[in-house]
């Protein structure tokens, strides 16, 4: 199982580059850069990371088909991959209606079909072939004007529901959302046949289980609200009525931390003392997870987070 780190999107862009260098020095396999709206642009940060590092893999997770024309995504990815000398993995995902439609005014229709269409078009352009067809409703007649001196980046899809997971079979891998449990990873692997699975994971350990719990509780409650009743919460063992309460609290703008139990947190995050946290990491390995991406909490010192994560993974 590969180990990766994801600098928080609200970190200064230059700081994110420094953190990536620290992750490389600490022996991490990959660094993942998110593109959440409206935070720092992932391609700019990835270019900085590519120029400042020499070994570590660089993942962008994920870019959506709505805000960037397919030609622009191919241009950016190919150029970034050249700087990285073939170390880039490009993650593509459908995003969500709140960001696209409510915030940016972009119609959010047929997200899965749009993502699949867009992914195929990006792959065509990155392979050096000409694209001559409708892509997301636009007639595209184009090809890259240059031939990169390295293989094209891997394409992975950020997906979570059964329909999206089934549609991702043509990708080089899948990126699972935060709070993917070992049970969910195992289900994805066995049900959909995905062999290279990456997942964002919340990690918070301390000398006592209670301290580790407190540091991760607010984020766990928030993301449980985001997922609501779904395969992610079901495979983590949450009854539908419990998962629904987290969703209701999020929509009402109220904290749901009081709904959490130690069992719930342990099912979706790496937390507690070192023994319990290491056991959860081992469960991820046994589930078939290919890459565990530790999410930066945006508050703690990055060096300490990197040290703790590396200590938990028996590699």
Where are the predicted features?
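Active-site-adjacent structural elements that line small-molecule/cofactor binding pockets in enzymes
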Residues: 1-315
């Amino acid at each position: 199982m590969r180990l990766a780190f994801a600098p928080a999107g609200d970190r200064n862009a230059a700081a994110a580059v420094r953190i990536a260098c620290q992750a490389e020095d600490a022996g991490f396999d990959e660094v993942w850069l998110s593109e959440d709206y409206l935070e720092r642009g992932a391609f700019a940060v990835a270019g900085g990371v590519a120029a400042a590092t020499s070994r570590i893999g660089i993942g962008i997770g994920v870019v959506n088909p709505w805000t960037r024309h397919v030609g622009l995504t191919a241009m950016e990815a190919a150029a970034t991959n050249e700087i990285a000398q073939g170390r880039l993995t490009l993650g593509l995902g459908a995003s969500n209606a709140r960001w696209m439609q409510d915030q940016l005014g972009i119609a959010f229709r047929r997200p899965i079909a749009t993502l699949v269409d867009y992914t195929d078009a990006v792959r065509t352009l990155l392979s050096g072939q000409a694209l001559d067809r409708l892509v997301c409703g636009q007639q595209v007649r184009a090809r890259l004007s240059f031939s990169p001196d390295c293989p094209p980046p891997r394409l992975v899809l950020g997906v979570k529901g059964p329909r999206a997971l089934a549609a991702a079979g043509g990708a080089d891998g899948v990126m699972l959302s935060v709070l993917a449990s070992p049970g969910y990873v195992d289900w994805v692997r066995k049900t959909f046949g995905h062999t290279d699975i990456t997942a964002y994971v919340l990690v918070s350990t301390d000398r006592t289980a209670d301290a580790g719990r407190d540091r991760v509780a607010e984020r766990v409650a928030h993301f449980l609200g985001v997922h609501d009743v779904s395969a992610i919460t079901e495979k983590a063992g949450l009854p539908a009525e419990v998962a629904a309460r987290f969703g209701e609290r999020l929509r009402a703008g109220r904290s749901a931390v009081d709904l959490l139990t130690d069992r719930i947190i342990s099912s979706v995050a790496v937390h507690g003392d070192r023994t319990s946290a290491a056991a959860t990491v081992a469960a991820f390995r046994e589930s078939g997870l290919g890459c565990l991406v530790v999410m930066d909490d945006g508050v703690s010192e990055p060096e300490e987070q990197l040290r703790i994560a590396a200590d938990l993974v028996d590699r």
